Amino acid sequence: MKIAFCGCSWVSSVNRSHRDYDKMWQNIIAKELKATAMIYGKSGSTNTKIYTQVEQGLRDRCDTFLVFLTSPYRFNVAWKGKKWTIKNNFQDGICEVVNRGSKSDYWDYIGKYYSADIEVLNGHIITEAIYHKLSMSGKKFLIFRNAFKEHILKDSKVFKQDKIIQWGPYQLYSKKTPQYKSEEIVNHLSLEGNLVASNKLIGYINDNL
């Protein structure tokens, strides 16, 4: 059985050669379920990018999908190179987070074209698309709100579905639980945080899949 893990940095993992590879929450879950972890999550991914990860997982014939949404306050960089293309299934497109550290040309784009409200709306649309795509595929799946915590539309029913879980590893990154945080591991969680995340997620999987 192959489990697809889709998302942003919260779902990314260290390399197989890293001493802590087996201690990442995705690999703990895969071992518990006697499955192969197919980790598509990448740092900085937008929800659009996460949608393309789901598509890749379907092409790779994954059996189960665990999808972790990201903040809608990100955007796809379409003017650098030609990486956001149909030809490569949009796999190599660049994504960027809106923050003070953004590059000057990104701020030029943000000032002219970026709308936080539109990106939130796009996030809802993409979530609905992921939900319906996986529903139609017949695959087992769960979608976790994770870092998509802003401005849930009152008339949006997709976030009320049983397959959408109102939690994610992002919630462990808190001032109240500094022992779960790490600046050195790519998924932002300490080894203790990874263990806590895996236990909580296995509980959701057992209860909902």
Language-model features: where?
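Serine-esterase "nucleophile elbow" of acetyl-processing enzymes
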Residues: M1-T48, E55, S190
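Alpha-helical cap/lid subdomain in secreted, periplasmic
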Residues: E55-L209
